[in-house]
A protein has these predicted regions:
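Short coil/turn linker motifs that delimit alpha-helical repeat modules in TPR/alpha-solenoid proteins
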Residues: 3, 7-10, 23, 79-80
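Helix-turn-helix repeat elements of alpha-solenoid scaffolds
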Residues: 5-16, 53-71
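Structural motif corresponding to the intra-repeat A-B loop/turn of tetratricopeptide repeats
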Residues: 4-8, 41, 98
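TPR/TPR-like (Sel1-like) alpha-helical repeat modules
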Residues: 19-27, 35-40, 53-64, 101-119
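Residue at a conserved register position within TPR or TPR-like alpha-solenoid repeats
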Residues: 1-2, 38, 45, 95, ...
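Boundary/linker segments of alpha-helical solenoid repeat arrays
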Residues: 22, 27-30, 73-81, 113-129
Length: 135
């Protein structure tokens, strides 16, 4: 909703809810949305300490997502999952956000190998938004 109407209250609620979800179960999808919202908030606020906190928490969250998903990829059952391509997409975005471009590209290529046009479009749109808010 925030991206549609720029109402910061929607962004604050998203951060609160995604943050709770992330802290409860460390699901990569929830965590990626939490980190993204934190970066959006950092762009909106003038107060220096809060801006630093939001960006730090986003980076910390993405590093934990990377750790969790790298462990998952090494699990013998990984290829049986139905969301492998989205895990690759998430890893690509997380690595991109912490300036590990080679790893980001590696996982982007893995995502692109078997993705449909709408999935690629979704990935590219998310990547574009991420680049805009972290630069």
């Amino acid at each position: 909703m925030y991206l549609l109407n720029n109402d910061v209250e929607f962004l604050n609620r998203a951060i609160e809810n995604y943050g709770k979800g992330w802290n409860i179960n460390e699901n990569y999808y929830t965590g990626e949305n939490y980190a993204f919202c934190l970066n959006l908030k950092a762009q909106e606020i003038a107060e220096s300490d809060e801006k630093i906190y939001c960006n730090f928490e986003a980076k910390k969250t993405r590093r934990k997502i990377i750790e969790n998903l790298e462990n998952e990829i090494n699990n013998d059952e990984f290829q049986n999952r139905t969301d492998t391509k989205w895990i690759y997409a998430t890893l690509s975005h997380c690595y991109l956000s912490i300036e590990m471009d080679d790893k980001a590209k590696e996982f982007e290529n893995m995502f692109l190998e078997n993705s449909l046009d709408w999935e690629i479009e979704t990935f590219e749109n998310s990547k574009k938004q991420l680049i805009e808010i972290i630069n």
